[in-house]
């Protein structure tokens, strides 16, 4: 019985997918909830462009799913910028620089 169980567990380990771990040194995802007309969103876009930082932008007026995500955050106002688990409401270059530095950017 023990031998059968051991054989099963070994075989199962051969066919089960390996766990996926974050790559060492991988940077946190940067996401911004924004609108096309928001002046602070424009400042954040320019900041990301100047520094060559890749980010995901979600226009909360054009994307239903994006608006639902924004609402689940309990957000008010734009932009809302996420750097991994850290959140910033509005735009402050100093604060965003610190969040990005803490995330390895």
What is the meaning of each model-derived region?
Residues 1-8:
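Bacterial N-terminal signal peptides that target proteins for export
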Residues 35-42, 60-64, 90-94:
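Soluble non-cytosolic domains of exported or imported proteins
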Residues 53-66, 75-78:
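Thiol-based oxidoreductase modules, predominantly thioredoxin-like and allied folds used
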Residues 17-19:
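N-terminal signal peptide c-region/cleavage motif recognized by signal peptidases
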Residues 94-105:
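Thiol-/selenol-based redox modules, centered on thioredoxin-like
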Residues 78-89:
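A short, hydrophobic beta-strand/beta-hairpin element that forms part of a small beta-sheet core
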Residues 24-51:
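Local sequence-structure signature of Cys/Sec-based thiol-disulfide redox active-site neighborhoods
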Residues 11-13, 23, 59-62:
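Short glycine/proline-centered loop/turn elements that form peptide/ligand docking sites
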């Amino acid at each position: 019985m023990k031998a059968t169980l051991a054989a099963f567990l070994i075989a199962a380990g051969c066919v089960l997918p390996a766990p996926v771990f974050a790559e060492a040194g991988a940077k946190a995802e940067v996401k911004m909830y924004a609108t096309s007309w928001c002046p602070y969103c424009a400042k954040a876009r320019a900041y990301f462009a100047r520094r060559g930082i890749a980010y995901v932008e979600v226009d909360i007026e054009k994307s239903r799913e994006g608006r639902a995500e924004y609402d689940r955050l309990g957000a008010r106002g734009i932009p809302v910028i996420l750097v991994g688990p850290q959140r910033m409401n509005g735009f402050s270059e100093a604060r965003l620089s610190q969040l990005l530095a803490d995330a390895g950017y």
